C-alpha cells in the first residue's frame, strides 16, 4: 500500500497493516509516533515532524528573531506535534512564545484569535496544521489589520491556500521538501505528469513516486511480493530515486531528509 496522507489516518491504519502483514509506505505522514511501535511493515519516504519542527525553529531563531512570537495549532496529531517541536526548540534558545494555543479544525471565524494576537503585540506566528484553517486566518488577519509574519509546514504549502487567503498569502513562510520537480533528472517525469494534467509541484508528489520506486525495486530484487522479505530488503538497501538516494533505518524512517524554507506567493507559486 502507498498511503496515507494524514498522520491521524496513517497511525490507526498502520495497526491493521502490521496485524495483517501488509507492507505500507507513506509519502506524506510525518508524525514520529507512526514508526515508534516497532512495526516491521511500516515505512515512509518523507521526513519527520521531529526533523521539520526543529528545522523551522532554527530558522525562526536565526533569521526571524521575533520579539513576540505566537504558536498556533489545530489540536491534531500533525499540527500540534509540529507546534510543540517548534516551541521546545525556540524556548531552548531563549524565545518564550507569548501564546501557544489551539484552534478547532473546521472553524471558519477566527476573529477572537486574531484579537488576542493583536492584544499580545504578536509580530510572528508559527502555525501547525493544514491550509484550510491557516488560509482563513491569513485572510481574516489582513481584513482586521493584523500584519504579523506567518510560517507553516508542508501541510499549508499548496495552491489552495492562495485560493482561500488571496493576497494575504503573499510572503507566508513554508517549510517544504525541496522542489524535486525542478531537478533536471526529473524533467521527463514532470512532462509525463503534465501530459496527464497532473500537478507535479505538490510536496508529496515525488516522495510518493519514490515510494512506488522502492517498493517495485524490492519486488524485482527479491523476486517476491512477501511483505517480510520486502521489508528486510528495504532496510538493507540503498535506493536511487526521484528524490535522491534513500536509505531506511530500523524503524522504517529515512536516514536523511532535507527541508527548505520557501516564500509563498499569492499566485500559488513559491521561491526559496
Language-model regions: role of each:
Residues 1-272:
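Extracytosolic ligand-binding ectodomains
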Amino acid at each position: 500500500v502507498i498511503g496515507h496522507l494524514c498522520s491521524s489516518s496513517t497511525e490507526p491504519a498502520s495497526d491493521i497493516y502490521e496485524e495483517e502483514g501488509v507492507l505500507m509506505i507513506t509519502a506524506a505522514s510525518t508524525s514520529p509516533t507512526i514508526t515508534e511501535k516497532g512495526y516491521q511493515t511500516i515505512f515512509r519516504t518523507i521526513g519527520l515532524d521531529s526533523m521539520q519542527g526543529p528545522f523551522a525553529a532554527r530558522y525562526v531563531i536565526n533569521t526571524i528573531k521575533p520579539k513576540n512570537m505566537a504558536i498556533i495549532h489545530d489540536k491534531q496529531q500533525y499540527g500540534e506535534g509540529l507546534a510543540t517541536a517548534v516551541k521546545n526548540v525556540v524556548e531552548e534558545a531563549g524565545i518564550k512564545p507569548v501564546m501557544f494555543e489551539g484552534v478547532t479544525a473546521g472553524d471558519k471565524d477566527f476573529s477572537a484569535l486574531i484579537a488576542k494576537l493583536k492584544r499580545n503585540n504578536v509580530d510572528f506566528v508559527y502555525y501547525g496544521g493544514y491550509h484550510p484553517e491557516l488560509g482563513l486566518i491569513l485572510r481574516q488577519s489582513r481584513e482586521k489589520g493584523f500584519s504579523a509574519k506567518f510560517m507553516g509546514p508542508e501541510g499549508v504549502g499548496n495552491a489552495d491556500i492562495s485560493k482561500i487567503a488571496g493576497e494575504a498569502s503573499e510572503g507566508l513562510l513554508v517549510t517544504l521538501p525541496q522542489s524535486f520537480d525542478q531537478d533536471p533528472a526529473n524533467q521527463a517525469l514532470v512532462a509525463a505528469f503534465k501530459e496527464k494534467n497532473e500537478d507535479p509541484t505538490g510536496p508529496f508528489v515525488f516522495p510518493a513516486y519514490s515510494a512506488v520506486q522502492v517498493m517495485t525495486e524490492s519486488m524485482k530484487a527479491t523476486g517476491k511480493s512477501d511483505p517480510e522479505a520486502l521489508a528486510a530488503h528495504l532496510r538493507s538497501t540503498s535506493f536511487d530515486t526521484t528524490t535522491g538516494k534513500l536509505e531506511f533505518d530500523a524503524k522504517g524512517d529515512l536516514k536523511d531528509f532535507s527541508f527548505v524554507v520557501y516564500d509563498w506567493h499569492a499566485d500559488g507559486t513559491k521561491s526559496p
